[in-house]
C-alpha cells in the first residue's frame, strides 16, 4: 500500500485500453485489397493448410486476414471486408475476412451457421 506522500508525488496510473485489432482504427470493419492470397501451417499441436490473405486496408495498413469456410474465390486485387478476431493457432493473424461481402463469395452448400459464412437460405 502506497503512502499519501508517495501518491502525491506519483499518482496512480489508470490502466490504458489496448485494442486487439489496432488496424481497424476503432471501426467495426474495414475495406481492403488483397495483395497476396496463400496458405500457411498452424502452430505445434495442430496440422492443416490454413487459407490467409495479406490485405492492404483503406487506411494504408497491411494486415494478415484469415479466410474462413470451405473453399473461396479470392485472389490478388480482390476487394474484401475485414473484421477483428484472431486465429489462435496462426501467429500474426488478428483479422477475419467477412464472407458474402464485396468480392468474397459466401460458402457454397452451407446449411448450418450460414450467417457467419455469407450463405443464402437454401430453397427447401
Swiss-Prot record:
Sites of 3-methylthioaspartic acid modification: 89
GO molecular-function terms, A-Z: rRNA binding; structural constituent of ribosome; tRNA binding
Record's keyword terms, sorted: Methylation, Ribonucleoprotein, Ribosomal protein, RNA-binding, rRNA-binding, tRNA-binding
Gene Ontology terms: cellular component: ribosome; small ribosomal subunit
Superkingdom of the source species: Bacteria
Region (Disordered): 1-25
Stored Pfam families: Ribosom_S12_S23 (PF00164)
GO process annotations (BP): translation
Species: Xanthomonas campestris pv. campestris (strain ATCC 33913 / DSM 3586 / NCPPB 528 / LMG 568 / P 25)
Function: With S4 and S5 plays an important role in translational accuracy. Interacts with and stabilizes bases of the 16S rRNA that are involved in tRNA selection in the A site and with the mRNA backbone. Located at the interface of the 30S and 50S subunits, it traverses the body of the 30S subunit contacting proteins on the other side and probably holding the rRNA structure together. The combined cluster of proteins S8, S12 and S17 appears to hold together the shoulder and platform of the 30S subunit.
Family note: Belongs to the universal ribosomal protein uS12 family.
Assembly, per entry: Part of the 30S ribosomal subunit. Contacts proteins S8 and S17. May interact with IF1 in the 30S initiation complex.
Matching PROSITE patterns: RIBOSOMAL_S12
Protein name: Small ribosomal subunit protein uS12
